[in-house]
Design a protein with these regions (language model features):
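ATPase nucleotide-binding head domains, primarily ABC-like/P-loop NTPase cores
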Residues: 1-208
Length: 208
């Protein structure tokens, strides 16, 4: 871990959320003097670990998932303005709003975190993240395992969870591949792929 903001992309079910939770756990273990689950680790001490992981929707108080997330991120921003020794972990920022504004929100927050030189990791499924940051990508599906029936019990056989540097702005588009491998209704998936091809003629069908 080092100062600066890292944006992590990857396919659905590729372990991005688990990665953030693992980093959070490792940071706490290290600061309390315990071994961390790694062959080696370099982790500076921080005054606070701030996380936005999960859904804080509150129907009783009229908070949507998006509103709850924005309030939580706003509190993080206030904390970052006050101190620099902070670890910020944000999972799928702005995932519950439309892609255009969601992408802009990710860029704005990442730009803010980079400017304030805090340690931060932000996961996203949005393409077009142009704010200055380090970019990593979960490798995702093992290419020679594109066929077969994937279940929650054997998913680890299909996905490579390791990280690699990623200089591009596009994120993996593997939602349809996951749906096919999970055995979702073929008729519905074919309709979905027809719409995808209408929107993007260069888009290739998952199953030819």
């Amino acid at each position: 871990m080092e100062k600066g903001t890292t944006v992590i992309t990857g396919a659905n079910m590729a372990g991005k959320t688990v990665l953030l939770k693992s980093v959070q756990l490792a940071q706490y273990l290290m600061q309390f003097g315990f071994y961390v689950p790694a062959r080696r680790a370099g982790m500076p001490l921080v005054e606070q670990v701030l996380t936005s992981i999960g859904d804080d929707q509150d129907e009783l108080n009229g908070l949507s998932s998006y509103a709850a997330e924005m309030l939580r991120v706003d509190e993080m921003i206030r904390q970052v303005r006050q101190r620099s020794k902070i670890l910020v972990l944000i999972d799928e920022l702005a995932r519950t709003t439309n892609p255009v504004e969601g992408r802009a929100i990710v860029n704005g927050v990442v730009d803010f975190l980079t400017t304030h030189r805090v340690m931060a990791m932000v996961t996203t499924h949005y393409s077009g993240i142009t704010a200055e940051c380090r970019k990593l990508r979960v490798r995702g599906f093992v290419e020679n395992r594109v066929e077969g029936n994937m279940t929650l019990k054997n998913i680890n056989e299909f996905i490579d969870y390791s990280l690699e540097e990623d200089s591009g702005e596009e994120v993996p588009q593997e939602a349809m591949r996951i749906a096919w491998m999970l055995g979702i209704d073929r008729g519905v998936l074919e309709r979905v792929e027809n719409y995808l091809q209408e929107e993007n003629p260069d888009w290739k069908k998952t199953v030819q």
